[in-house]
Amino acid sequence: TEGREVSTTMVFVRILAKLLKDKEIGKLVVPIVPDEARTFGMEALFRQVGIYSHAGQLYDPVDKDSLLYYKEAKDGQILEEGINEAGSMSSFIAAGTAYNTHGINMIPFFIYYSMFGMQRVGDLVWAAGDIGAKGFMLGGTAGRTTLNGEGLQHQDGHSHLLAYPVPNLVTYDPAFAYELAVIIRDGIKRMYEDQEHIFYYITLMNENYAMPEMPKGAEKGILKGMYKFHASDKKSLKLKAQLFGSGTILNEVIKAAKILEDDYRVACDVWSVTSYKEIRRDALEAERFNLLNPTAKQKESYIEKMLAKEDGVFVASSD
């Protein structure tokens, strides 16, 4: 972002706006919001594509005089469901299974307060997995450190744990804009080009910070679940630490690395961990192959390959 501070939620809304404008797939994108469209900065989409209403706009919204007013239309594209996560998840399932039911590859993006997803409609998430729904669930305002103003009810630090058991749910906790872009692009490829029966859960933050450029060769690691964001250049230091960070906490990990190097003479490599679930999934697959094929060449998991030559203390932090 060239020094400009934005949140990953803002980045997602920009990605969504561009997808909606795409001449090929724009008409297939289904934005679904239970209640918090303005909280997520999505009001620009009201004017761009409108909010779907089978009857059209039957009243004058209170913000009619503003540029980005609450615009309902018969041809609107946003599903604004009110405070109704269960109904929104049902819309997600309907759109996410349209490829099977109607032969149309709809691409739903269901964004909501992350505390009110897995914790509130977990059964429907399992149903989506069972029925083969595709699409993206976005847990907005995730984490426990950047939404203190709204109280403990919104401080979600555990939705990823609830997402772990769903086998075909691919989960990510990205820190930077380029990570989010890579994940969404690959998700569209896997679900709609490769026809994999998976769906996605991605947490988004509301903390604003400058987004760096993508390090060369990082794309594979982003999708696999981890990559080295910064390698220490303090080769002369005897002590070493490997610091893992996810989501917005990665910024604090980067700061911690500098403090450790400058004040305590501990060389620190910083790793961005985008998905512990994907790392674990890969490790379990390697372990299973090795167990069932004892005479074949044994597979090495991604995390084993990445950390084989790394030493020092390993510290993992997330929000």
Residue ranges with predicted function:
Residues T1-G26, P212-G221:
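Flexible inter-domain linker/hinge segments
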Residues I15-L20, I25, V29-R38, A44-P61, ...:
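Accessory "access/gating" subregions that flank catalytic or transport cores
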